[in-house]
C-alpha cells in the first residue's frame, strides 16, 4: 500500500481480504473492518479522506455513524449502506444484512467503486490502510479475531 482506487475499482480482485472471528451473544459490539482512503499517496500523512467500515456482525444496539441508506449487493453480499460526516472526510459503512463471522477473498474494489460513484471519495485517491477487529461498546469478553489477511495483486 498505498493502492490507487482507480486500480481497485477497475481490476477485479486487485485487493482482497479474508477475516475470521469467534463471537459471543452478549454485550454490545461490532465486528468490522476499518479501511482508510486518502487523496494523498502516503501512509504517513494525516488522513483527510474517507473512513470505510465493513460491519460483518454486531449486537447490543450498536450502529454505524450517520444514517442508514440503501441496500446494495456488492461482491455477492447484501449490505445496508450508512453514511455520516464524522471525521475529516466522513465515514461510509457497509453493514452485512446477514451477519457473518467470516469472509473469504472479499474484493474491496466493488465497495470502493460504489463509494466513488456516490461521491464519498474520488477515483484518484488511494487505499492506505486496512484494519480489522472488534469495537466493544460494553463487555466483549470472548470476542476473538482468529485470522486476518489482505492481498494486493
State where each predicted segment sits.
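Short linear motifs at secondary-structure transitions and domain/linker junctions
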Residues: 7-12, 68-71, 104-109, 124-125
Amino acid at each position: 500500500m498505498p493502492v490507487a482506487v482507480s486500480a481497485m475499482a477497475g481490476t477485479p480482485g486487485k485487493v482482497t481480504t479474508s477475516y475470521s472471528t469467534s463471537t459471543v451473544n452478549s454485550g454490545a459490539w461490532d465486528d468490522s473492518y476499518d479501511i482508510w482512503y486518502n487523496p494523498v499517496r502516503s501512509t504517513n500523512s494525516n488522513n483527510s479522506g474517507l473512513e470505510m467500515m465493513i460491519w460483518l456482525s454486531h449486537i447490543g444496539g450498536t450502529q454505524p455513524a450517520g444514517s442508514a441508506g440503501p441496500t446494495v449487493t456488492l461482491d455477492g453480499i447484501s449490505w445496508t449502506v450508512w453514511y455520516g460526516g464524522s471525521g475529516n472526510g466522513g465515514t461510509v459503512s457497509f453493514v452485512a444484512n446477514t451477519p457473518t463471522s467470516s469472509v473469504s477473498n472479499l474484493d474491496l474494489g466493488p465497495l470502493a467503486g460504489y463509494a466513488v460513484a456516490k461521491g464519498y471519495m474520488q477515483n484518484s485517491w488511494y487505499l492506505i490502510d486496512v484494519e480489522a477487529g472488534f469495537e466493544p461498546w460494553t463487555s466483549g469478553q470472548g470476542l476473538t479475531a482468529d485470522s486476518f489477511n489482505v492481498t494486493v495483486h
